[in-house]
Amino acid sequence: MNLSGIKPPKGQVKTKKRIGRGMGSGHGKTATRGSKGQHAGTGFSQKRGFEGGQMPLHRRLPKRGFKNIFKKQFAIVNLGRLEKLEGNSFTIDTMLQLGLINKVYDGVKVLGTGVLTRKITVEAHHFSKSALEKIQQAGGTAQMIGAETK
């Protein structure tokens, strides 16, 4: 028995339907499209999601939610990642250089995930409550920049 001699089980591989290649093929003349009608000619293509007249799925399901055009997107930094890096002062520029964030978007937010054991100074637009607590407990400072006034 060779690898080159192995064949798939009988009936597993279906032969390709060669459409419009003569009457002897069984799929010549109208090429399985029937005679006349909207779908018989060239250029026919069904719309995406068309289900033969049945109410399509995207219309059967209810509308839900909306896109908030005022949503702000923040670049997120966790305290655990700051802990692993050398240095005691982290500004937005240093975070960009170190690769902690790729882009500032609408600001930088520091979250409290991770353990902080040393004193650090962090500069960001927003801080979570847990991040503020952990920074202050470690004896560090959190400087909020560009605080919006309403």
Curated annotation (Swiss-Prot):
One of its GO terms (biological process) is translation. Residues 1-58 are annotated as: Disordered. Pfam families: Ribosomal_L27A. GO terms for molecular function: rRNA binding; structural constituent of ribosome. SUPFAM superfamilies: Ribosomal proteins L15p and L18e. It comes from the Bacteria. Belongs to the universal ribosomal protein uL15 family. NCBIfam families: rplO_bact. This is Large ribosomal subunit protein uL15. It comes from Solibacter usitatus (strain Ellin6076). The gene is rplO.
